Curated annotation (Swiss-Prot):
Domain of life: Eukaryota
Residue span of region Disordered: 1-130
Name of the protein this chain belongs to: mRNA-capping enzyme subunit beta
UniProt gene name: CET1
Record's subcellular location: Nucleus
One biological process term in Gene Ontology: 7-methylguanosine mRNA capping
Alphabetized SUPFAM superfamilies for the sequence: CYTH-like phosphatases (SSF55154)
Organism, as annotated: Eremothecium gossypii (strain ATCC 10895 / CBS 109.51 / FGSC 9923 / NRRL Y-1056)
Length: 478
């Protein structure tokens, strides 16, 4: 009877609280959950099943109402992230049909009641791990909350920016830095590369204004000389002091601070230097000529001559001045010429002790029908005895004459005057060769004149330094 009674009575279904109590009792006592559970009455089972059926129907009705368009909510179908959870719908539908079969007592109900307790206990965990589709209204609410949070953050940042003081920069920003030129000439140039610097961006060294003026003056003067007389041209440079014509003892003082061309109408040159400076300069030039690197570059010539000046010509004609040069030791006539002055250029040097006179003359040979013997019995206008040392430097086309001159006025030794003259003479043949081809190439002509002026600058500055050393006590000359 008891077995039949048990078979006729329905099996008890475990509720969620039973499962939880089962797990707790299992952990506490260590016994199985089936032994601790108490059977429920039939009325209690029917009441719980009716309650679960009502809750499932209510959920389906809510879902049906959500799918309609009659409610107050709006469904944003145009959203790109909108999706419908078909798998979840199928699972919920299958769950509802299974509960209906269990209530009607069909085969599905028996199968559900025959499942082991372990599988029933693990079913809530499986459902909790399955992804749940987010409702579109919840998603919209989350987006709105994110936007509101962003607005709040921006509002707070704006308030901080408006009230906070600007911080100090470790490195000043570009708008607060001082302007620096992007192009800096000769910056970061290695000292070893200085030897490779170009003379100019055109690879040409331009002549200064004074050099250009002298070049033009020499060219114009040579052009004015008849071609047949150019071969007798003499270009020489002398050093002395420019004297004012109104006073023979005062040097001119124009308002200039550098070497410049001075008008010859306002001054005259006195070609003379101090004797001690004269001796020291001779020693200086001789020392340069004896240097090892200058071996063979200098030719040294010593001479002792006497020059006599004669005036020739009829009173109705232009007078001619003839110069007769004799060797003092032998008395032999070495040169008999007619010297004509063509032009001269005075250069005033306010920073130096001596000034410069550049003169261009023509030394024409006297015709054979007018021999020197013709003037032997005449008294010369003046005579000059010259003790000269000449240093000829062919590489620069320059001859340096260091001459001690004794002037005899009207041939009387009693009125002798001793002067010390420094003179540079330009090689006439080299100058004329460059002058003849100046139309094809003017570089040679400009180079010759420039080199001549450079040699004159070296001598002039050396004379000045020697003068300072002698007269200011820097050097004692015996």
């Amino acid at each position: 009877m008891s077995s039949e009674k048990q078979e006729g009575s329905p099996r008890r279904v475990l509720s969620l609280s039973d499962l939880v109590n089962r797990e707790d009792s299992k952990d506490a006592s260590g016994n199985t959950a089936g032994a601790a559970l108490k059977p429920l009455s039939n009325d209690e089972v029917r009441r719980r099943l009716a309650h679960e059926d009502y809750s499932s129907n209510t959920a389906s009705q809510v879902d049906d109402e959500t799918d309609t368009d009659d409610g107050l909510g709006e469904v944003a179908f145009d959203r790109a992230d909108f999706r419908f959870d078909f798998e979840g719908q199928e699972r919920s539908g299958g769950r509802a049909s299974g509960e209906a079969e269990a209530e009607s007592g069909g085969p599905g109900h028996e199968k559900a009641t025959q499942q082991p307790s372990d599988a029933i206990a693990t079913s809530p965990d499986r459902e909790s791990t399955e992804p749940r589709a987010m409702d579109i209204f919840e998603e919209r609410a989350s987006l709105e909350s994110k936007k509101n949070n962003l607005r709040k953050d921006l509002r707070v940042l704006n308030e901080i920016a408006s009230t906070a003081r600007p911080g100090r920069y470790k490195v000043a920003p570009i708008w607060a830095q001082k302007w620096k030129p992007t192009v800096r000439a000769l910056q970061n140039v290695n000292s070893k590369d200085l030897m490779k610097i170009d003379v100019s961006f055109t690879q040409v060294i331009p002549d200064d204004d004074l050099t250009k003026s002298v070049q033009d003056w020499v060219y114009a003067t040579l052009l004015s000389i008849p071609p047949e007389q150019r071969q007798y041209v003499e270009v020489e440079m002398k050093f002395g002091i420019l004297m004012d014509r109104s006073s023979d003892s005062q040097r001119v003082t124009p308002p200039v601070s550098s070497q410049t061309v001075y008008m010859e109408a306002d001054a005259r040159m006195k070609p003379d230097v101090d004797e001690r400076v004269f001796v020291e300069l001779n020693r200086y030039v001789k020392g340069i000529s004896e240097l090892t690197e200058n071996t063979g570059k200098f030719n040294i010539i010593e001479s002792h001559n006497k020059d006599e000046m004669y005036r020739a010509g009829i009173n109705t004609q232009r007078p001619r001045f003839l110069r007769m040069s004799k060797d003092v030791k032998t008395g032999r006539v070495g040169e008999f010429i007619e010297k004509r002055r063509i032009s001269q250029l005075l250069l005033f040097s306010p920073k130096d002790s001596y000034d410069v006179k550049i003169s261009i003359n023509v030394e024409l040979p006297v015709p054979e029908n007018d021999p020197p013997e013709k003037y032997m019995g005449q008294a010369p206008l003046n005579s000059r005895t010259k003790e000269r040392i000449s240093y000829i430097h062919n590489d620069s086309c320059t001859r340096i004459d260091i001459t001690k001159v004794t002037n005899h006025n009207k041939g009387k030794r009693d009125d002798a005057e001793v002067t010390h003259e420094i003179e540079l003479e330009l090689n006439s043949q080299a100058l004329l060769a460059a002058f003849d081809k100046i139309a094809q190439d003017s570089k040679d002509y400009a180079t010759i004149v420039r080199t001549f002026l450079n040699n004159g600058t070296i001598i002039r500055r050396k004379l000045t330094s020697l003068s300072y050393e002698i007269f200011e006590g820097g050097k004692k000359v015996v």
